Amino acid sequence: MAILKICTYPDPVLRKETVAITVFDEKLVKLTEDMAETMYDAPGIGLAAPQIGESLKLVVVSTARREDSKQEYMVMANPEIVEKEESQVDEEGCLSVPELLAMVKRYRKIKVNYQDINGEPCSMTVEDRFAVVLQHEIDHLNGILFLDHLSSLKRNLYKKKVKKWFLPR
């Protein structure tokens, strides 16, 4: 396994359209293992393929119950939200949007159709924090960052902060 480079805002790969996964092979297994290792090393609780420069509809999410438990994760290929209910506001951060935590409104309960690592169709209904994590990661597959859910004022303040990071000293 390998730790991959995480692409950060404003890298254009984060805004690219992703393509569906059609081949489920050892190469995909290796990619998901590397993504999981990268996610846990960061540390994070979810990672989408665009965040490591791959324009694929692929997500890994932590299923560990506590931070100190072993590294358990699930793979979701071609995930799609097919049902959504209610809303909630929760704090989010993103490995691709460093140094920003913000309150974001999301659905409280969602149903997601996806394929597992073997290409088998699956469906799951999730609530609360896990629903937030999945919506956040699926947004990445559509070129959407959690930054896009913020007010224009907060978004512009963050963009100015990022520009300062790249100014010559």
Swiss-Prot record:
SUPFAM superfamilies: Peptide deformylase
One of the protein's GO biological processes: co-translational protein modification
Broad EC category: hydrolase
Alphabetical UniProt keywords: Hydrolase, Iron, Metal-binding, Protein biosynthesis
Entry binding sites for Fe cation: C94, H136, H140
EC id: 3.5.1.88
Residues spanning the signal sequence: none
GO molecular function, one term: peptide deformylase activity
Cofactor: Fe(2+)
Highest taxon of the lineage: Bacteria
Active site: E137
InterPro entries, per database record: Peptide_deformylase, Peptide_deformylase_sf
Cofactor note: Binds 1 Fe(2+) ion.
Record's catalysed reaction(s): N-terminal N-formyl-L-methionyl-[peptide] + H2O = N-terminal L-methionyl-[peptide] + formate
Role noted for this protein: Removes the formyl group from the N-terminal Met of newly synthesized proteins. Requires at least a dipeptide for an efficient rate of reaction. N-terminal L-methionine is a prerequisite for activity but the enzyme has broad specificity at other positions.
HAMAP family for the chain: Pep_deformylase
Assigned protein family: Belongs to the polypeptide deformylase family.
Name by which UniProt lists this protein: Peptide deformylase
Native organism: Desulfotalea psychrophila (strain LSv54 / DSM 12343)
Gene: def
